[in-house]
């Protein structure tokens, strides 16, 4: 399955709007609305991009 419209592409940097203490994360993979992100302080997290709008970030 490909990325859903509006989801960040792999290798991009994002922040979780409700978890600022997680820090910046790099998108590892995208499968539809399922986005796997490796955050600085939370490790790998699977995000449902249909529910959470990840914010663009810069490392």
Language-model regions: role of each:
Residues 1-15, 21:
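Mixed-charge, Lys/Arg-rich low-complexity intrinsically disordered regions
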Residues 35-39:
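SH3/SH3-like beta-barrel fold
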Residues 23-29:
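Short beta-strand-centered aromatic/proline hotspots
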Residues 44-59:
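Intrinsically disordered, low-complexity, charged/polar segments
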Residues 20, 40-42:
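Glycine-centered tight beta-turn/hairpin loop motif at sheet-sheet or coil-to-beta transitions
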């Amino acid at each position: 399955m490909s990325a859903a419209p509006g989801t960040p592409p792999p290798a991009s940097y994002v922040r979780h709007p409700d978890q600022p203490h997680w820090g910046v994360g790099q998108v590892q993979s995208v499968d539809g609305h399922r986005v796997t992100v490796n955050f600085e302080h939370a490790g790998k997290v699977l995000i449902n991009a249909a529910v959470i709008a990840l914010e663009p970030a810069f490392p």
